[in-house]
């Protein structure tokens, strides 16, 4: 008999997959060639990516018996999935839309098959911790809750249809570029956390007496406005009043959250993506003479500009960790106790 949490994860995946298939089926021929904000993939490329590698994925690793806490920890530190993703997309560029649609229809079959034969002997491995970044940790069991991936890319495709986007080539100083990879990795981890949140959890308090999970998302979405102010100050485009305002941290944060009251989760994620792109555009404008600038925090601490870029990514990871208790996996576990 399949494990109840695995059956729930598979049902969630099937529901998310039907949603993604519906979005793909609604595309016109010209929609497939539209670019997806804010990168350089087309909708066709995004569908090719959403298919995945057709493997059993995490469930296959569990069955293979290769997972140990040490293996997971070391792999999470060095493995960067983006190169593999780019390779898969490049290889599938020769496929027709019909080919990709068929592959997408079958894409999760192996994963589901292997997941449903997991049993109680696999419970210790499902409980292994998977470090995702500062203050952000999930479990091996969360790998089985893969519906987030289809939800995320369904929204990406919708965004491409709604926006006229053309890729922008951004280049960074080497000192900045050295931090960008980790910033992007933590952003992907944050999106995983966002699209894993249960629909009925958003309006619940993340902490007793504090913001709801949706308000926390509003803060995360708007927070890039803070580094943008600091970067514009370095570029000579922000005044003292603006830079002083962001140091009144609680007041500034609450004002940004209040401005987004009533926004849908999807609108907040759109805001999140747009704001991050604007931050990257500012980072691309930095020149060697700007590298000597220091960034001051409300605490009085100061960091170098390259270190501050790393801080932007760590903020994403920290808030992703805050969202984990609201995930579909945790909600199911809570209801099952």
List each language-model region with its residue ranges.
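Conserved small-residue-rich
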Residues: 171-215
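Extreme N-terminal tail/first-helix region
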Residues: 1-14, 165-184
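Long, hydrophobic N-terminal alpha-helical segment
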Residues: 19-20, 24-31, 36-41, 190, ...
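Acidic/histidine-rich alpha-helical segments that form the ligand environment
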Residues: 79-125, 144, 182, 186-195, ...
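Active-site-adjacent scaffolding segments
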Residues: 1, 8, 12, 63-73, ...
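Short, contiguous alpha-helical
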Residues: 33-80, 123-170, 203-251, 280, ...
């Amino acid at each position: 008999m399949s494990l109840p949490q695995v059956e729930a994860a598979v049902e969630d995946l099937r529901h998310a997959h039907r949603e993604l298939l519906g979005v793909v089926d609604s595309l016109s021929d010209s929609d497939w060639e539209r670019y997806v904000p804010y990168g350089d993939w087309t909708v066709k490329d995004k569908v090719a990516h959403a298919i995945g590698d057709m493997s059993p994925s995490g469930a296959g690793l569990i069955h293979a018996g290769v997972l140990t806490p040490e293996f997971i920890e070391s792999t999470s530190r060095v493995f960067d999935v983006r190169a593999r993703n780019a390779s898969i997309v490049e290889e599938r560029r020769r496929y027709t839309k019909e080919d990709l649609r068929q592959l997408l229809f079958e894409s999760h079959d192996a994963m589901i098959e292997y997941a449903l034969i997991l049993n109680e002997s696999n419970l210790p491995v499902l409980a292994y911790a998977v470090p995702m970044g500062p203050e952000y940790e999930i479990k091996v069991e969360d790998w089985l809750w893969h519906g987030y991936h289809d939800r995320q890319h369904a929204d990406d495709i919708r965004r491409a249809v709604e926006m006229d986007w053309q890729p922008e080539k951004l280049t960074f100083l080497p000192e900045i570029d050295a931090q960008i990879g980790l910033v992007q990795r933590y952003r992907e981890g944050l999106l995983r956390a966002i699209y894993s949140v249960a629909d009925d959890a958003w309006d619940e308090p993340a902490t007793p007496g504090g913001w709801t999970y949706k308000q926390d998302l509003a803060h995360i979405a708007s927070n890039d406005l803070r580094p943008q102010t600091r970067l514009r100050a370095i570029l000579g485009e922000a005044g003292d009043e603006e830079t002083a305002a962001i140091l009144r941290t609680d007041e500034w944060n609450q004002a940004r959250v209040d401005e987004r009251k009533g926004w849908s989760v999807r609108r907040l994620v759109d805001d999140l993506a747009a704001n991050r792109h604007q931050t990257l555009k500012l980072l691309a404008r930095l020149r060697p003479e700007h590298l000597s600038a220091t960034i001051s925090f409300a605490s009085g601490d100061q960091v170098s500009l390259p270190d501050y870029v790393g801080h932007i990514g760590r903020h994403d990871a920290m808030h992703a960790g805050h969202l984990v208790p609201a995930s579909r996996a945790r909600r199911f576990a809570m209801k099952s106790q």
